[in-house]
């Protein structure tokens, strides 16, 4: 069996040094405890996460490309990892251990002898310097910052020299410059290399969050971006011994508390006969918020460009005039929407594209127009959830996948069909942006769904006309009778009013109100909707505010937070459950989506019902619970009401711990349950079964995985190719693994075992096979990842 990763969706971690654009054209970024490697030019004009690197055990805080095949990362698990990777994703990794707290910034540089000098800074108030050569690493120095904290650091080789300069910023609003000295014993024997402090650059009035070096002829330029909204450019220029003697300033007599801007040159001795002058080149002001990232780029003509990213939702490219005055050349960013701003930005290797990642983990990419260099246009990018993904559901024909997350959003993922290219998957809409963490969802039809969050209400939504038009165009949807019926009657879109949680429908007439009737408040609404005809998948800015679905109805009836939802295949029934500690609240409520009225309440469980599943023909409703039992309800003839017909108890229940998941086979002959006790049980109705509470249902096959908790299970939508009695099941575990099994006549056979790099590195929350002829599996987990796999049987 071959399993190919068709789609991976995940957001960038909320850290300032957490994304980098490498010289190989790939973007690496921290994604929960993993590192995602994305190709932003996949198939020319698309984007795709190629693979993930999993070794960190806590959140990844920082990533830094050192070369085309070397990547350095640091995480909250107090380690840094040096990765060596090739185009296929095959990696070797070397773990740098020594810190006692989370590593928050890293850098590295290749030296003239071919070895690597690496620097790591952590929350344990230390900076560690390492050498790496021939697959061996050594920590040769630890710089203690006393009670200080390092936000950013950079290493740089001085031009025409093997001398290394270390710059780092701390919580004292300064930038420290250190250089290496070779210490010798009294008789001239070398004791080894050590870095010593040479100077502190003062002037900023708040923490410095971004640093970057660039070589300018024989000089170095250092850019520092600060939370005081200013960028300072520092020039480090070589000086002869004669110049040094004329201009020398005794640095040791400078007060460390002198906050005054010092424009005069400061002479540094970096080596025995190497003298450098440090001076303030320029101060740039253009941002209205904290500056979190700066990045240099040198054009083929040796012209310098500086990129700055700020929490004020803008990214600026700065360029010097002929007179040497630095001016703003390009400004891009977000407008409107529920966003905070940018946590970092980078140039591509050729400088014709720029990337920024936001507080909510979304990526933005802009590319320079070849014909009009001053025009930068937004491009297609991959994003995802920035919180644990708790539920997913396929549209009934497999046209799209919808996911719900603790980041308070539901997102719709669909393929982008282009002529002459394989489809690539992208986020096409964000139907719900809520004020509560999302928990569950169920699709009622192609353009209607219900969702539950950490509130007592079930909310239902219907797609607006603008989404239907764009969805058809991007995904190549034809023969869409459901959409044809809705197009003329539906609102164009939706928006969320100030201080509201409900998506309010926006009709065409809303935008045609005479301007004379508008108050100043109405002219600039907090969240607005403008119909857009999309040719490509939408950018993050559009997704945040222009792809909401109008809310149809709120369903009241539960006493606690919604926990699980399920709908029949035809969307004629909706079932919901909530968190419960007694039988009254553990009841399942059935709703009629045609009039949104309660049909009945189903009793049977004592504690929270964790998952629900209707049989393909809607005859049965299966529920599993925290009370370690499953209940089966059967639909009464010519009625919409259900009745409890089978359940397990202490004497006949196979499971001994909470039952997390359940599913039906496509033919309705079997259902499966999985539990924290590591057991997966397939149940079938047998005529000769004597157990009264089971009413003929009995365990047909039990799979037990020792020391595993099975948190998700799913049947495929067809038999194994060429058979009429062989089923395929997928299991997800608490450790993040996905296992695919063949099940035939009570026997299990493992077909494929996906490791943490291929699957998830935290708990798998939901699995579901895509409806249709293809064998494709969707998964989501607590690691923020949503994945779609294409499975080929060999």
Swiss-Prot record:
Protein's cellular compartments: Cytoplasm; Nucleus; Cytoplasm, Cytoskeleton, Spindle
GO BP: any one term: establishment of mitotic spindle asymmetry
Cellular component terms (Gene Ontology): cytoplasm; elongator holoenzyme complex; microtubule; nucleus; spindle
Keyword line: Cytoplasm, Cytoskeleton, Microtubule, Nucleus, Repeat, tRNA processing, WD repeat
Record-linked PROSITE patterns: WD_REPEATS_1, WD_REPEATS_2, WD_REPEATS_REGION
UniProt free text on domains: Folds into a two seven-bladed beta-propeller structure which is required for elongator complex assembly.
Annotated protein name in UniProt: Elongator complex protein 2
């Amino acid at each position: 069996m071959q399993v190919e990763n068709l789609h991976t969706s995940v957001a960038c971690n909320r850290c300032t040094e957490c994304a980098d654009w490498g010289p190989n054209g790939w973007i690496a970024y921290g994604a929960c405890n993993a590192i995602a490697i994305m190709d932003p030019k996949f198939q020319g004009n698309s984007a795709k996460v190629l693979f993930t690197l999993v070794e960190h055990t806590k959140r990844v805080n920082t990533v830094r490309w050192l070369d085309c095949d070397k990547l350095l990362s640091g995480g909250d698990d107090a380690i840094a990892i040096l990765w060596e990777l090739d185009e296929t994703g095959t990696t070797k990794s070397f773990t740098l251990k020594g810190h006692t707290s989370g590593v928050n910034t890293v850098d590295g540089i290749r030296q003239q002898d071919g070895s690597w000098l690496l620097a790591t800074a952590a929350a344990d108030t230390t900076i560690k310097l390492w050498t790496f050569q021939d697959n061996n690493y050594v920590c040769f120095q630890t710089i203690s910052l006393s009670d200080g904290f390092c936000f950013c650091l950079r290493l740089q080789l001085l031009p025409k020299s093997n001398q290394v300069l270390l710059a780092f910023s701390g919580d004292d609003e300064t930038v420290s410059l250190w250089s290496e000295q070779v210490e010798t014993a009294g008789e001239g024997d070398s004791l080894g290399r050590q870095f010593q402090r040479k100077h502190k650059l003062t002037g900023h009035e708040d923490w410095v969050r971004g640093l970057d070096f660039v070589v300018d002829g024989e000089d170095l330029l250092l850019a520092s971006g600060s939370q005081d909204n200013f960028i300072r450019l520092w020039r480090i220029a070589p000086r002869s011994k004669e110049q040094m003697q004329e201009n020398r300033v005794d640095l040791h007599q400078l007060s460390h508390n002198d906050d005054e801007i010092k424009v005069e040159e400061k002479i540094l001795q970096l080596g025995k006969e190497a003298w450098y002058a440090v001076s303030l080149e320029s101060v740039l002001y253009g941002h209205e918020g904290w500056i979190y990232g700066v990045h240099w780029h040198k054009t083929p003509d040796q012209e310098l460009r500086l990129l700055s990213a700020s929490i004020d939702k803008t990214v600026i490219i700065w360029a010097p005039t002929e007179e040497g005055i630095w001016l703003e050349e390009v400004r891009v960013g977000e407008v409107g929407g529920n966003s905070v701003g940018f946590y970092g930005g980078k140039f591509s290797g050729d400088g014709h594209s720029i990337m920024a990642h936001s507080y909510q983990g979304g990526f933005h990419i802009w590319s320079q127009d070849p014909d009009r260099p001053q025009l930068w246009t937004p491009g297609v990018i991959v994003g995802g959830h920035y919180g644990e993904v708790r539920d997913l559901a396929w549209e009934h024909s497999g046209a799209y996948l919808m996911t719900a997350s603790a980041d308070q959003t539901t997102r719709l993922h669909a393929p982008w069909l282009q002529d002459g290219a394989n489809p690539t998957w992208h986020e096409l809409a964000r139907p719900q942006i809520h004020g509560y963490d999302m928990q569950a969802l169920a699709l009622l039809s192609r353009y209607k769904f219900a969702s539950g969050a950490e509130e007592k209400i079930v909310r239902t939504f219907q797609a607006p006309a603008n989404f239907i038009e764009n969805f058809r165009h991007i995904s190549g949807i034809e023969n869409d009778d459901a959409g044809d019926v809705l197009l003329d009657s539906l609102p164009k879109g939706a928006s969320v009013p100030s201080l509201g949680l409900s998506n309010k429908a926006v009709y065409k007439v809303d935008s045609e109100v005479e301007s004379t009737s508008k108050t100043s408040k109405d002219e600039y609404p907090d969240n607005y909707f403008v119909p857009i005809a999309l040719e490509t998948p939408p950018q993050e800015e559009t997704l945040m505010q222009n792809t909401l679905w109008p809310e149809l109805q709120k369903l009241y009836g539960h006493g606690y937070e919604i926990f699980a939802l399920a709908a029949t295949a035809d969307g004629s029934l909706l079932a919901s459950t909530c968190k419960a500690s007694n039988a009254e609240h553990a009841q399942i409520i059935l709703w009629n989506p045609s009039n949104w009225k309660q049909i009945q309440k189903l009793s049977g469980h004592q504690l929270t019902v964790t998952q629900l599943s209707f049989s393909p023909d809607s005859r049965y409703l299966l529920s599993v619970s925290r009370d370690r039992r499953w209940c089966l309800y059967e639909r009464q003839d010519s009625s919409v009401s259900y009745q409890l017909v089978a359940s397990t108890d202490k004497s006949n229940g196979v499971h001994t711990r909470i039952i997390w998941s359940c599913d039906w086979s496509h033919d309705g002959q079997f259902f499966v349950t999985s539990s924290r006790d590591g057991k997966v049980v397939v149940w079938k109705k047998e005529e000769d079964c004597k157990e009264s509470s089971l009413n003929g249902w009995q365990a047909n096959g039990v799979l037990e995985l020792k020391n595993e908790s099975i948190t998700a299970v799913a049947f495929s939508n067809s038999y194994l190719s060429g058979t009429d009695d062989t089923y395929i099941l997928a299991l997800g575990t608490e450790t993040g693994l996905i296992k695919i099994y063949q099940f035939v006549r009570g026997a299990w056979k493992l077909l494929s075992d996906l490791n943490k790099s291929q699957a998830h590195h935290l708990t798998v929350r939901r699995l579901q096979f895509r409806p249709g002829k293809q064998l494709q599996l969707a998964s989501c987990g607590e690691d923020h990842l949503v994945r779609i796999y294409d499975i080929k049987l060999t």
